[in-house]
């Protein structure tokens, strides 16, 4: 099966929906990207935290298989694949400790299936940068470190909660979970996201309830000048 799963019932053909969170530092173009994808018109302002509450838009995803399935099963209705995008408030250094709108931001991002991280790659003195200068590599590191620290807090809390119980009772499931969490904790302490650990499906299922952000797939969207797309190469050639 391709990227989207399909459920076929007697009277319905249902395409599964996915969600993505558009994230990044404040004022880097997240809302601009959201508007372009969803064709909405939310506020785009030249100051940090123009977005407070998350904006949500749903896009129907074209799929050529839909006509084939309609002809095969002749369903009474077809529910197409949709992709729900959420424009989330900007993240700043210290977000994992509640700086800016950090805690609120992180609670929203845990609910999505994938992360789209918008990174500014152009200079414009008329557009404010929260850190005073444009440095895409630094900006990516700021966000990724905060996501790692947020996951680390959750993993550490869980280890502290069931660690003693697992050592005392020797419960097989608890011991298995602790061993996996210790492995994840060690990686996070080395600034390694969970998605790079190569977890198998059983391991992912074991930690699924934690909604670890760094386990989610991530796409980097580089915001460049309209008339000079090659400016991104200054920051990505390495």
Predicted regions and their residues:
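Short, Lys/Arg-enriched N-terminal segments with co-localized hydrophobic residues
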Residues: 3-15
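Conserved G1/Walker A P-loop phosphate-binding module
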Residues: 14-92, 103, 109
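Residue-level signal for inorganic ion chemistry
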Residues: 33, 69, 116, 155, ...
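Active-site flanking residues adjacent to catalytic metal/cofactor-binding acidic residues
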Residues: 86, 119, 222
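Short acidic, Gly/Ser-rich segments with clustered Asp/Glu that frequently serve as metal-coordination loops
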Residues: 91-92, 225-229
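Phosphate/Mg2+-binding loops and adjacent switch elements
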Residues: 96-219, 229
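Conserved small/polar residues in nucleotide/adenosyl-binding loops
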Residues: 235-238
